[in-house]
Amino acid sequence: MADIMHVFAREILDSRGNPTVEAEVFLDDGSHGVAGVPSGASTGVHEAHELRDGGERYLGKGVLNAVNNVNEEIADAIAGAEADDQRLIDQAMIALDGTENKSRLGANAILGVSIAVAKAAAESAGLPLYRYIGGPNAHVLPVPMMNIVNGGAHADSGVDVQEFMIAPIGAESFSEALRMGAEVYHSLKSVIKSKGLSTGLGDEGGFAPSVESTKAALDLIVEAIEKAGFKPGADIALALDVASSEFYKDGKYHFEGGEHTAEEMAKVYEQLIAEYPIVSIEDPLQEDDWEGYTALTAAIGDKVQIVGDDFFVTNPARLKEGIEKKAANALLVKVNQIGTLTETFDAVDLAHRNGYRTMMSHRSGETEDTTIADLAVALGCGQIKTGAPARSERVAKYNQLLRIEQQLDDAAVYAGRSAFPRFQG
């Protein structure tokens, strides 16, 4: 395998107009990899540290310090390393940083290099990224969890739930699933317009109408599914990202005008899954409510996927604790929450070995980088959420999955309804 010859980073803009890190790695055989690092709006307190410059430039959100850390310390530390030694390279960067949460060099600096190394190594090996990482058996295309109504921290719609997603579980292939999702998305626009509501978009390409409640938003989506000619629950299921830490204050959940306990929120979710074909609920409780998650999983975990995002932050140590406590039953996978590819691999492997499902995920601040599409297939996640079928930084990932499905040809398998516990057994 070729050796790393040169490592370089620059400051670019993400989809929200904020700076982020782009890293490039060049190998001595001429191979090259480039990676753009995403950034979240609603971030868990346990996430790896995203290094920002502060000051007046870019309203304090510049990343020149992270860029300099790549161009100086990290570049020197990994120069000459064999590019296929991903784990050794990631470990070297973690050791160089020397902090528990990558706060000295910045997870955004380390992750950019980690991904760029893998891309360069894949090019050197003459393999697509999903095949280089996942090996010859990587063949499952994920269910696209399309965020078509944006709320919470992703929009100014007034609704507390952050994401309302559709999951085309009845499709026979990824390409058919993408078509179904796009048709419902356009149908939803006409439904929203017919009710005199705004068709403005949130950060992730979903509509952000001002609706009075979670149920009102779900009713719009169900109407759109039916208008597009599909059957809710059979063809297309629903999913929520509640991001409840965003409205948890002073020991209570400030949800839809009331103050609720974890037990009361559990009853809200039980009612929702009884009334709507919901297959997945993400971050239903505050990120450190271990007891609440255990109780909620015992109550409804056999009926619905309970996904830990801020709860697990793609961290193997937190996931291990969740497994021991039987808290949640699925892991949201965000590479920038943990900061290296190999730590991400470890988290996904731990989840799968313990019967937890996994959903690969973008962030609300994205770039045109399509790495997560390849990772979803490589790691056998079975689900991916990367926004609405709109805005090029979202669609880029879906289009990459179309390419992968075409490359796999008859070997491609679409995860479909088998990805969710509601349809098991």
From Swiss-Prot:
CDD domains: enolase. Pathway: Carbohydrate degradation; glycolysis; pyruvate from D-glyceraldehyde 3-phosphate: step 4/5. It comes from the Bacteria. Its EC number is 4.2.1.11. Its main location: cytoplasm. The active site is at E204 (proton donor), K334 (proton acceptor). Its cofactor is Mg(2+). It is found in: Cytoplasm; Secreted; Cell surface. The keyword Transmembrane helix does not apply. GO terms for cellular component: cell surface; extracellular region; phosphopyruvate hydratase complex. The keyword Cell wall biogenesis/degradation does not apply. Binds a second Mg(2+) ion via substrate during catalysis. InterPro entries: Enolase (IPR000941), Enolase-like_C_sf (IPR036849), Enolase-like_N (IPR029017), Enolase_C (IPR020810), Enolase_CS (IPR020809), Enolase_N (IPR020811). Belongs to the enolase family. Catalyzes the reversible conversion of 2-phosphoglycerate (2-PG) into phosphoenolpyruvate (PEP). It is essential for the degradation of carbohydrates via glycolysis. This is Enolase. It comes from Corynebacterium diphtheriae (strain ATCC 700971 / NCTC 13129 / Biotype gravis). The lineage of its organism: Bacteria, Bacillati, Actinomycetota, Actinomycetes, Mycobacteriales.
